[in-house]
Amino acid sequence: MKIIVQKFGGTSTATSHSRRLIYDHIQKACNNGYKVVAVVSAMGRFDDPYATDTLLSLVNKTNLSNEELDRLMSIGETISTLVVKSEFADINLNVATVSNEELGIITDDFFSSANIIDTTNTYLLEKLEKYDVLICPGFQGHTKDHILTTLGRGGSDLSAIALAVSLNAESVEIYSDVNGVYTADPRIVSNAFKLPYITHKAMLKLSLEGAKVLNHRCVEMAAKHNVTIHARSSFSNGWGTQVSDDYEHLCQYPISGVTGAFNNALIRLHNMDNDERKKAYIYDTLKENNIIIHGTHYQPNLNASGNYTLMINEEDAPKASQIIQDIKEILEVDRIVVRGSVGRVSIVSDDFEKYPHIYEEAVYTLVAAGINIIISSKDESCARFFVDKKDVREAQCLLHDYFFSKTKEAFQYEKV
């Protein structure tokens, strides 16, 4: 049995016209001999009647438990499965919807942002023996005690990958309102272009650094299980972008992309020992609370201690600072200072080890243009520069123009 998973986002499910395109994509896959598992998101976006944010706006959230809020938020996807299936009447395919329980996505009880801990495929495989197409609700799962949970923003992408792993699907096609993965946000960088191929590693970094095409948790799971993702537009038959490690050799440029974010914050711990155990404790504690750390930096003082800076999303700053405040005595720090309204520009590359001067050339490019780098960090595949919010757009354009103006072959011989 050949299985393909297709995921359709809110813009794809929003109207009868856009849903007509869903049926075209599904029909094409079936004509090519596939059984199709279609994962659907809630219809539309905020102000559309069944979008997740609209459903949340109906209630006083303080009077509902997290478990109850998850039940509310899951309604949009459930409605989508029934609407999409109801309009299949004129297509000669056997189609069935799938319930939350039948999905077989088992999670922890971290409501509103649950983590997948296991999958079962019994119900789905039985149904695939009888039906050509299964319409599945994205964004949701259930605990081992059969309590409904939701997977957080972008959770339908994660649902699609989890089902592909569970069913050993050939690939996952993720349809949205964009044509694929671009070298930068084309709304900011006018000469950004679409990448036909990208590695899991580079795509994961781009997602973590702010690229909106694919949810980072979905890419992480796909990389772990070597699942090929095809990011495509619902509204065209173009190639899009294929995420697979089979195409690493086809990358022509020294970097894979440039991203920017306007909503960062810095948390600085003053007079902390340069103790790796303490750093690991901070990292693990924040990660347990689903707080993403974009980078860290340790600056030694003249005495034995120094200042340790964490780079996070601004919306997480109050929660993160309180968590660190609660463990302040364990960390033995003098004070904790939070700085908001910070922007971030990142460059992602599979080749930092091969071209170590990428980082230095990025610094030179920004400084030469008069952009102040507040702090920076780098790892084996990403360099991040934290700058004033007002400089984020210009910095993205500068770095994109510099690094995509030359191929790898030309770049490797150049130094600052």
Predicted segments, located by residue:
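Short phosphate-binding/catalytic loops that engage adenosine nucleotides
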Residues: Y34, L93, V227, I291, ...
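A conserved regulatory-domain signal marking ACT and ACT-like small-molecule sensing domains
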Residues: Q242-V416
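Internal nucleotide-binding/catalytic subdomain
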Residues: S171-E173, A231, S236, Y253
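Terminal amphipathic helices with adjacent charged low-complexity linkers/tails
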Residues: S41-R45, Y50-T52, A231-Y247
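Nucleotide/pyrophosphate-binding catalytic subdomain
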Residues: M1-V219, V387-D388, T407, Y413-V416
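Membrane-embedded hairpin module used as a gating/binding unit in multi-pass transport
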Residues: C218, T228, D246-E248
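Acidic/polar loop patches that form or flank catalytic/metal-binding clefts of enzymes
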Residues: N215, T228-S233
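Acidic-aromatic/histidine active-site loop/patch
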Residues: A222
